Regions:
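Short, intrinsically disordered, charge-balanced linker/junction segments flanking boundaries
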Residues: 1, 5, 225-228
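Divalent metal-coordination and catalytic microenvironments
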Residues: 10, 21, 42, 65, ...
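Active-site mouth loops of central-metabolism enzymes
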Residues: 18-31, 85-99, 159-166
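A cross-domain feature marking catalytic cores of carbohydrate-active enzymes
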Residues: 22-24, 49-50, 78-82, 115, ...
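Divalent-metal coordination cores built from histidine and acidic residues
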Residues: 32-140
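Histidine/acidic residue-rich metal-binding segments in metalloenzymes
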Residues: 95-185, 192-213, 222, 226-228
Length: 228
């Protein structure tokens, strides 16, 4: 006899689902309320990029997100935002450079580098961005490369960036897969790419071991209505 026996007659047993890329802040909910909605649909692990709160509060905002989820019954991980501020000419609450990011490396729950939105910076060897890629070179590097293809995509992939969640068509996703980038199929509130991509996956009988699902940005009302 085990310490706890569960009668699973006529029930399904599934592993917990993983939301591989999301931004809690865009739901306009606190971490505990957002996580409760995800848990209700069987999601037990969140991989987040808290760049919204980081744009306002810097490292303190990221540390808050980690601390606010520490006692929750969910596995919560952070990809440190790579583009704070989002563009060089913006006035944000802080500038999150490689030196500031280094302070977060030892924190429990920090996995790697958040979505690298500065595609021109990667392709043109921007020194500040290369310093961030170097800092996280032994960790997971998330990408953000909408409609990128050809030699530019090859250059982006050569930087070590491993994932992308911005594909809106199967042809785009397939080219990125062939470049060695894992595809996170996005089905959120603003962007819904599942139908377009999954048809190609099924039609081409693709090996899906380098594919996963994510929401990116999804509102609580949508999660309650249709799941995550």
């Amino acid at each position: 006899e085990g310490e706890r026996v569960i009668d699973a007659t006529n029930k399904y047993i599934l592993p917990g689902f993983i939301n591989t890329h999301c931004h809690i802040e865009s739901s306009m909910a606190t971490p505990d309320n957002y996580c409760a909605e995800e848990l209700a649909w069987g999601v037990t692990t969140l991989i987040t990029d808290p760049h919204e709160i980081a744009n306002v509060a810097g490292n303190k905002g990221i540390e808050y997100m980690l601390e606010a989820t520490r006692a929750l019954p969910i596995n919560y991980y952070v990809q440190v935002p790579s583009c704070v501020p989002a563009t060089p000419f913006e006035h944000a609450g802080c500038v999150l450079d490689a030196e500031a990011m280094a302070e977060l490396l030892s924190l429990d729950g920090v996995l790697g580098l958040g979505e690298v939105m500065n595609v021109p910076g990667v392709l043109n060897n921007d020194s500040s961005l290369l310093a961030k890629l170097e800092l996280f070179k032994d960790r997971i590097l998330d990408g953000h490369a909408p409609l990128l293809g050809g030699k530019a995509l090859q250059g982006y992939a050569a930087s070590g960036i491993e994932t992308d969640h911005e594909s809106i068509s199967w042809s785009e996703a397939k080219e990125k897969l062939r470049a060695g980038i894992a595809i996170l199929v996005r089905e959120g509130s603003a962007s819904r790419n599942l139908a377009a991509i999954i048809q190609g996956v099924v039609g081409d009988s693709v090996d899906t071991r380098r594919m996963a699902f994510c929401t990116d940005d999804k509102h609580l009302a949508d999660i309650r209505r249709e799941g995550t």
